[in-house]
Amino acid sequence: MADPPDANVPKTSPYLKGDELSSDSGPLLSIFALQEIMQKVRQAQSEYVAATKDVDLTVPDVQKIIDGVKELASETIYKIVQKPIISYRHVVMQSRDRFLRVDTYYERMSEVGDKIDENEPAKFYETVIKKVRHLRTEGAFILHNIPTKDHRGMEIADPEILGVDVKSILPVLTAEHRAMIQHVLDGAIIENGNIATRDVDVYLGACSESVYRIYNRLQGYIEAVQLEELRRTVTWLERLGKRKRMTFSQEFLTDFRRVDTIWVLALRLPANPRVIWDVPRCSIANLIMNIATCLPTGDMFRPNPRIASITLTQRITTTGPFAILTGSTPTAQQLDDVRKIYLALMFPGQIILDLKIDPGERMDPAVRMVAGVVGHLMFTAGPRFTNITQNMARQLDIALADFLLYMYNTRIQVQYGPTGEPLDFRIGRGQYDCNVFRANFQTGTGYNGWGLVDVENREPAPYDHAQRYIRYCNIDSRELIHPATFGIGMNYHCYNEMLRMLVAAGKDTEAAFFRNMLPFHMVRFARINQVINEDLHSAFSMPDDQFNVLLANMVVGQQERVDPVILDISWISIWYAFNRSFEPIRRNEMLESAPLIESVYASELTVMKTDMQQMALLQRRFPDVLIEARPTHFWKAVMEVSPEPVRAIMDLAHSHSFINIRDMMRWIGLPSMQNSMKLVLEEEAWAVANDFEELMLTDQVYMYRDMLPEPRLDDIERFRQEGFYYTNMLDGPPAIDRVVQYTYEVARFEANMGQLRAALRRIMDDERWVRFGGVLRTVRIKFFDSRPPEEILQALPFDYQTNEKGGLTYATIKYANDTTIYYLIYNVEYSNLPDSLVLINPTYVMTKVFMNKRIVERVRVGQALAVMNKRFIAFKGKMRIMDISQALKVGTKLAAPTV
C-alpha cells in the first residue's frame, strides 16, 4: 500500500544513474571519502612530481590495512615454551677432562644480518636493526609446563630445560666424571614459588646474559600484574562507552581473574594521540583512518514533499528559481557532490569545499541563485572553523545578491552602498542591510556560525587532545532527536535573519518554504552534531591546538604541518544537499575495536621512533662506518622491518615520497610515547645493544703477523689430554705502544704514493700491530678440526685494490669487511710422528680480534655446569596464560535512542 502524500515518513533519495532512476541503500561513506580525498591528493602530487620521479598513486585498500592492524593486536611478541633455548654447548676435543664451552647466543647472532660496507650505510643500519630484533625475539619467552621428573621424592628439572647441552661430552667422560655430572643434574631441584598470588616453579639454569636480560624484563613486566593499569583502562573504556553510546562488556573479567589464570596486558589504553599526530605528513592518513573506523553507514533522506508543494509550487505557473529546481532529480555525480558536502560538515576545518569550474552550471542563473541562498544556511564560515574556502564564500555572496535583486514578483526598493562589494545594499521597505550576510571569517557573519558558540568545552572528553564539542545551529548533541517533533519551535540567528531578509526582499514564498523546512534542517544538523561528537571522537581526531589555527592560517595564507583537504562540488549539489539529510542507519562495525587499533598503531609508532632515536646516535659513535650516512638511511631501514599494516597507514596518502630530513629529525626528537610490552622489550634490547659486542660487532680488529703453531709430538698422550687448540681471538688488547692506528686519511695518503703495502710490510717486520680505523665489523665464529681454508688463514682486515684506467692508477680501500674468529682444534693419533704437524715453510696468519666477551672458554669437567646461575620462573602446567589485550574493546553498540 502506498504512503499517503502527507505521510511524515522520510524517504531515501533517488538519483539518475545514466537513464535509470536509482536509490541508495546505505552506501559506505568512508570508502567514498577515501576515494575522493585520494583523488584530490593524487591530483596535487602528480603535479608536484610531473618532472621528477614516479610515485605510486594507487588507492590503498583501507579495509585490508585495518584488518592487518587488528591482526597485529592478536599477535604476541613473546613465545610460550616448555624449555628455554640452549645457551651453552660443548665442543669435544681429544682430552677426557677439557672441553671448549661455547656461548651459542653469539654463534646465532653472528649469522644475523648482511655484510657491512662503509659505502652503504643503509646495509649497516639494516644489519643493526635485524640483530636487535633477533635479540628481542630470543629473549621474549615465557616458561610454561616445564618437563620435570622425580628423584628420591624430590621434583628435579629435566636436563633439557637447564640451558646447557652436556650430551656431547658424556660419551668421552670417565665413569667418575659422569657420576659428578649426574650428581649436579640430580641437584637441580624445582622449588615452589608464588608470584602475584599464582603458583610457579622456580629453578636455576643457564642462560646467556643478553638473552636473560630480555627474559628478566619480560618476567618483571608480567609479575608487576598491572592491576592499576587495568583499572585505568576499564574506567577509560566506560567513559568512552558513555561518550559513544556503547556498553562496555565485562564478561572477560570473570574469567581472567580466576586463580588458575596468568593474564598479560600487552597494550595500554587509551592510546596517546600525540604519538599518532606527531608522524610526518599524517593529517590526511589520520583523517581517512578516522572516517574508516568511526563513520556510521547512512542513507540520504528527503523532507516531506508537501513542504515544497504548498509553498514553492502551489501555483500552476512557477517562474521563481526555487520552484524551477524543486522537481529536479540529481545525477550520480551530483549525489557524490552531496556526499562531499556532508563529509565537510562532519569534519569541519579538515575538509573544506570549493566550487568546481563548470561552465554549464555557471550559465544557469537559477542554480546559482538558489545555491547562494541555501549555502548561507548550510555552511559555516567562521569565526572558529569553516566548511568553505574564501573563494566559495565570495561566490555564494554574489549568488545571494543576485537572488535578492532578481525581481520576478514585484518591484522592491534597493539602496546601493558605496563599495560595490557583494551584498552592499539595503533592500525593502524597512531597508534591511544585506551587508550582514557578506562573509566575514573573523566574525562568522552571514553563515551558520553567526552569533553562535559553535565550538564549546564541557565535560572532559575521553581523549585529552580533542576536548571540543561541535554545536552546529546551537544544537546540543546530548538532546534526544525524534524526527516527528524535533526542530519545531527551534531557531538560530542566521536562519532568522535569512527569513527577515527574504521577507524584506519580497520573497514571501521562499520565506514560507524555509519556515517549513526549519524542523528538517535542525534534525539534519542535530544528527551531524551527534556523529561528530560521539562516533567520530577518537585518537585520529584532529587535536584542538591544530583545529583552532586551521581557519586563521587559511585566512592569512600561512602553511602549517596540517592543512585542510579541499573537495570540489557543483553549484546545484548545494541545493540537493539542503533537500537531503544524512541519516545514520548502522554504526561502524569497527567502532568497538577502534581503541585497540589506535593502541596497536601508537605502540608500533613508538617502537619505530625508539629504533630511529638509537640509530641517530650511531653515526656519532662510529663515524668511520657511516661516512656517507644520512637520516634517510635509518628511516628506510626501520621502515623495512616495520609491520606492513603500520607502514600502509603512515603512507595512506602516499606522502612518504615527500618526507624530508627535517620532518624525520623533528619526529625523532619529539617526546611523545605509547607504553606497551613491545616498547619495554625494545628498549631493553637497545640497552643491551649499547655494547655492540653483544651484537657480534667489534672495532678491535688488528693486523699482526703470527705463525700458526706447529707443536712437536714428543708425548702424544699428554698432548691429547691438554686439548691443544689455536685461535685468533686475543685474551687482551695488545700493548698500546705497539699499535699503529691507520685511519682512512693515512691509508689513502700512502696508497696515493703507491707505498701502502711497503709501509705495512715494515710494520709487520717490526712485530707491531696495525688497527685500521674504528670501523665496526661483523664477526663470525667457526670451528675447525683440521687446517682451515687459506682464505680464512690469509685474510686481511682490509680490502685494497688497484686498477689502471686512462693512464692513471686508482686505489680502493675498504675497512668494513667480515672478520672470522676461528678455533683450530688439533687432533692427533698415536701413530703420528713427532714432526707430523711441522711444515718446512711456516703458515702465517694476519688477523687478530679482541672482544671483551668470553664467547669460547676451555673448561674442565667440574666447570661444565658452573654457568647454571640464572633464576628461571615457570608457570605450572595447570595454569592458563591469557593475553587480555583482545578483550579491551568497548563492547556492544547501542541503538541511538532517537528514532
UniProtKB/Swiss-Prot annotation:
Subcellular location: Virion
Keywords recorded for this protein, A-Z: Virion
Region span, Disordered: 1-21
Main location class: virion
Short name of any one Pfam family annotated for the protein: Orbi_VP3
This protein's record includes keyword Glycoprotein: no
UniProt-recorded Gene Ontology molecular function terms: structural molecule activity
Keyword Methyltransferase: no
GO cellular component, as recorded: virion component
Family to which this protein belongs: Belongs to the orbivirus VP3 family.
Job description of the protein: The VP3 protein is one of the five proteins (with VP1, VP4, VP6 and VP7) which form the inner capsid of the virus.
Name of this protein: Core protein VP3
Naturally occurring in which organism (per UniProt): Epizootic hemorrhagic disease virus 1
